[in-house]
């Protein structure tokens, strides 16, 4: 029996779960366009979907904000239909054997800071910054980072008067304990600084593969929160970031030193990482680790031709030229030369073995099976399928905030499971939603 929503959308299989409600793959009946459909039972004690849809509508028009297509109710459910997105950063992290190269971390950091900046500019804080809540786009927006799941978002100031919410203490932990700021653990009301501190932990999670306060044993959730808090408080920023460029220490120090109602200097934080990116000699070619894992090594003629076929006008020719330049540079430079630059930024340290392995365009291969994490079938069978080209841009600066054609990943039908966003296919987004006081 065919299930329909609003007589406009055909309801398909479940592809994930958000902090509140389940997410399904849907199809627009008239056009065949695939969408994400979030459902929430109308009998739930604390309905959130209507509130979340208002947040999304407030954010509409921002780069990396999912487009809301339709909101309403159908039978026993509140419904929100939104733009379909690709895999979450948590899914991609698992796909890349739970370690990102420094280049990929810096490419992501720039976009993620921009997304948080935009949300704050609209007078809201997210309060659940984690890899599951950042998704990659699809098609032409395949390398654009999106931020999702506003189920825990909160207005931190009045839009007209700009009056900030008051400082409070004895607040319950809201968000995910693994990435929560120190002040959140201490029961202090969250503000803009806390979103950015959480992002700092996400970036170090990508660098390290795991944070020092993961995997702690406890009898119950409350004790686990306490153990995470104790470990986080006792781990200095210098120790946490040991073996990685000092910019990560500077970033976290900056976040922790901010006052409760202080406006963060987002430009300064982006510049920290952009300067490091340039110093290491990386190129803004939008080639992330997951691109290399699938396609391997330098550009080949077929990939360059795909870029040419998929791009428009002069931008297309520029992309092709840049892709060719990346191929030539990758062929000419050795892994040792690239690693030398990374080592210099690390002050002589070599970083982790897995990190070194991914520098200089060296590739890894995963041939089928389950990549682990959140029950996502990552590759093999009906798993990950990248069917668009990776068109590089010939630029020394990151033009992330223009929604131009980027390298892309299109997800085809695959194993479901997991939760957290509006991803689809073999890489559904996320790992069990946001939740209040998630102990992950």
UniProtKB/Swiss-Prot annotation:
Principal location: nucleus
Reaction(s) catalysed by this chain's protein: L-seryl-[protein] + ATP = O-phospho-L-seryl-[protein] + ADP + H(+); L-threonyl-[protein] + ATP = O-phospho-L-threonyl-[protein] + ADP + H(+)
Annotated consequence of substituting residue 80 to I: In dbtL; lengthens the behavioral period
GO cellular component: cell body; cytoplasm; cytosol; nucleoplasm; nucleus
A Pfam family: Pkinase
Biased composition annotated in UniProt, kind: Gly residues: 413-440
CDD domains linked: STKc_CK1_delta_epsilon
Modified residues (Phosphoserine): 333-334
Phenotype when changing residue 38 to R: Increases the period lengths of circadian rhythms and displays an increase in hypophosphorylated per. No effect on interaction with Bdbt
Domain annotation Protein kinase: ranges: 9-277
Region (Disordered): 376-440
EC number: 2.7.11.1
Gene3D superfamilies the record matches: Transferase(Phosphotransferase) domain 1 (1.10.510.10)
Subcellular location: Nucleus; Cytoplasm, Cytosol
Region annotated Nuclear localization signal, chain positions: 221-224
GO terms (BP aspect): behavioral response to cocaine; cell communication; cellular response to light stimulus; circadian rhythm; endocytosis; imaginal disc growth; locomotor rhythm; negative regulation of apoptotic process
Function: Serine/threonine-protein kinase which is involved in the circadian rhythm pathway, viability and planar cell polarity. In the circadian rhythm pathway, phosphorylates the clock gene period (per) and targets it for degradation in the absence of timeless (tim), thus contributing to production of the circadian oscillations of the clock genes. Together with CkIalpha, regulates processing of ci by phosphorylating it, which promotes its binding to slmb, the F-box recognition component of the SCF(slmb) E3 ubiquitin-protein ligase.
Subunit record text: Forms a complex with per. Interacts with Dlish. Interacts (via nuclear localization signal) with Bdbt.
Record-given protein name: Discs overgrown protein kinase
Organism in which the protein naturally occurs: Drosophila melanogaster
Gene, per the UniProt record: dco
């Amino acid at each position: 029996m065919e299930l329909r929503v609003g007589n406009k959308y055909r309801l398909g299989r479940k592809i994930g779960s958000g902090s509140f409600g389940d997410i399904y793959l849907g199809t627009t009946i008239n056009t065949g366009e695939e969408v994400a459909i979030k459902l929430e039972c109308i009998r739930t004690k604390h309905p959130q979907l209507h509130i979340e849809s208002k947040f999304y509508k407030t954010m509409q028009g921002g780069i990396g904000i999912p487009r809301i297509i339709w909101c309403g109710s159908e039978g026993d459910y509140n419904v929100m239909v939104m733009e379909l997105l690709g895999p979450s950063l948590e899914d991609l992290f698992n796909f890349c054997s739970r370690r990102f190269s420094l280049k990929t971390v810096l490419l992501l950091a720039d976009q993620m800071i921009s997304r948080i900046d935009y949300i704050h500019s609209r007078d809201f804080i997210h309060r659940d910054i984690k890899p599951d809540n950042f998704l990659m786009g699809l098609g032409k927006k395949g390398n654009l980072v999106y931020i999702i799941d506003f189920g825990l978002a909160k207005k931190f100031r009045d839009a007209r008067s700009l009056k900030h919410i008051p400082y409070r203490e004895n607040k319950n932990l809201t968000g995910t304990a693994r990435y929560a700021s120190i002040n959140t653990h201490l029961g202090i009301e969250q503000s803009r600084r806390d979103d950015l501190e959480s992002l700092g932990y996400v970036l170090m999670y990508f660098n390290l593969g795991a944070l020092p306060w993961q995997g702690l044993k406890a009898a119950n959730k409350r004790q686990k929160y306490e153990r995470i808090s104790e470990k986080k408080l006792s781990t200095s920023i210098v120790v946490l970031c040991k073996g990685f460029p000092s910019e990560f220490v500077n970033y976290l120090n900056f976040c922790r030193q901010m006052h409760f109602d202080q406006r963060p200097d987002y430009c300064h934080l982006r510049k920290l990482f952009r300067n490091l990116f340039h110093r290491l000699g990386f190129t803004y070619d939008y080639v992330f680790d997951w691109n290399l894992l699938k396609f391997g090594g330098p550009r080949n003629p077929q990939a360059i031709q795909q870029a040419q076929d998929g791009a428009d006008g002069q931008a297309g020719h520029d992309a092709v030229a840049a892709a060719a330049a990346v191929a030539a540079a990758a062929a000419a430079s050795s892994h040792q030369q690239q690693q030398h630059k990374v080592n210099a930024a690390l002050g002589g340290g070599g970083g982790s073995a897995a990190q070194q392995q991914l520098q200089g365009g060296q590739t890894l291969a995963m041939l089928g099976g389950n990549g682990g994490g959140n029950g996502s079938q990552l590759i093999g069978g009906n798993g990950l399928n990248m069917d668009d080209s990776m068109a590089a841009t010939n630029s020394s600066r990151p033009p992330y905030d223009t929604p131009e054609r980027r390298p892309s990943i299109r997800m085809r039908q695959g194993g479901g499971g997991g939760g957290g966003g509006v991803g689809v296919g073999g890489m559904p987004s996320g790992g069990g939603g946001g939740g209040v006081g998630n102990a992950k």
